[in-house]
């Protein structure tokens, strides 16, 4: 009888392990936190940048270096469209050095870069950007379709948003997308949503940030990505995710309301000034800047502060969230 009970208990724990652990296939990483007096984590976010220094990319990179030095940043996040116009042709494409290694040269930017893919990256050889060969060329480079990064009091959930966008499949125009390891699309999306939801629910971090390329709430030129509104936004809301960070629209933007997920766009890494703004509730639209720039985040256990900068390093917008009174 006792053996039967013990065996049943073991089976129960094994079942729980396989249900909650093995079904998530997202790669998990840990970034060690520096020992700072306030125990904080600092990083920069840049998107839509890779133009071999053109369209003010080099100027933005310089200001990133200046701010990165002041904040003593831990790492940099890239929200996609890393190489224009059509990603990389292969691991030996000179665009990697011309748009990345030779541009972000400031000492403060010699930190780990964590990157996701944008739609322009999918127009090239996706496997090249995911390859360890690039890491051998420049140790800072790390790019995956989707993954989880833990650093101190923050868990980051990087999500590949490109396959969600139906028109890339039904109306590709004259573009060719590299959908290797993505098809069948519906299964890929279903698995990703399952894994994201599972990983976010498992997280015990103080702060939970989701990072993707496409916007969920945006007044930018591209407008909202309805597929993400329908499929990803409910997961963010159910799990009380603090921030959704994206690029795609070539602007700097903050949309948010009291007590809910804040939506931060940092897509001003190079070409910008689209001159088109979608109508949006002014109570939610805290910042819309149709130009080049980037953002910084400084995180402690009690506060998440974020600042937007233009191409000259001028501060455009400051805001913060507090854990002591939920969201501000």
From Swiss-Prot:
Catalytic residue list: 222 (proton donor)
Any one annotated GO CC term: extracellular region
UniProt entry keywords in alphabetical sequence: Glycoprotein, Hydrolase, Iron, Metal-binding, Secreted, Signal, Zinc
Cofactor note: Binds 1 Fe cation per subunit. Binds 1 zinc ion per subunit.
Catalysis performed (reactions): a phosphate monoester + H2O = an alcohol + phosphate
Binding-site list for Zn(2+): 81, 119, 213, 248
Pfam families registered for this protein in UniProt: Metallophos
Binding site for Fe cation: 48, 81, 84, 250
UniProt-recorded name of the protein: Purple acid phosphatase 7
Gene Ontology MF term list: acid phosphatase activity; metal ion binding
Glycosylation sites per record: 56
Family of the protein in this entry: Belongs to the metallophosphoesterase superfamily. Purple acid phosphatase family.
Reported cofactor(s): Fe cation; Zn(2+)
Source organism (scientific name): Arabidopsis thaliana
Subcellular location: Secreted
Signal peptide: 1-24
């Amino acid at each position: 009888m006792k053996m039967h009970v013990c065996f049943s208990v073991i089976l129960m724990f094994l079942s729980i392990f396989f249900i909650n652990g093995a079904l998530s296939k997202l790669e998990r990483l840990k970034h060690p936190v520096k020992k700072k007096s306030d125990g904080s984590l600092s990083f920069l976010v840049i998107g839509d940048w890779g133009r071999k220094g053109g369209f003010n990319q080099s100027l933005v990179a310089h200001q990133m270096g200046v701010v990165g030095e002041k904040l003593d940043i831990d790492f940099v996040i890239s929200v996609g469209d890393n190489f224009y116009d059509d990603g990389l042709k292969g691991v030996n494409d000179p665009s990697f050095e011309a748009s990345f290694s030779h541009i972000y040269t400031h000492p403060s930017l010699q930190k780990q870069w964590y990157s996701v893919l944008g739609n322009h990256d999918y127009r090239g050889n996706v496997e090249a950007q995911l390859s360890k060969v690039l890491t051998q060329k420049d140790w800072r480079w790390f790019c995956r379709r989707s993954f989880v990064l833990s650093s101190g009091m923050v868990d980051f959930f990087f999500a590949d948003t490109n396959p969600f966008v139906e028109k890339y499949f039904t109306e590709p125009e004259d573009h060719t997308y590299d959908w290797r390891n993505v098809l069948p699309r519906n299964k890929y999306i279903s698995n990703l949503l399952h894994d994201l939801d599972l990983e976010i629910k498992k997280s015990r971090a103080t702060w939970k940030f989701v990072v993707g390329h496409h916007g969920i709430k945006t007044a930018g030129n591209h407008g909202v990505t309805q597929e993400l509104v329908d499929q990803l936004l409910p997961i963010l809301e159910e799990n009380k995710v603090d921030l959704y960070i994206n690029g795609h629209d070539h602007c700097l933007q903050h949309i948010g309301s009291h007590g809910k997920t804040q939506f931060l766009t940092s897509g001003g890494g190079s070409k910008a000034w689209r001159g088109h703004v979608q109508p949006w509730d002014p109570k939610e639209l805290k910042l819309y800047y149709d130009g080049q720039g980037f953002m910084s985040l400084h995180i402690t256990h009690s506060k998440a502060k974020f600042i937007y900068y233009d191409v000259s390093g001028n501060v455009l917008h400051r805001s913060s969230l507090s854990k002591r009174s939920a969201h501000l």
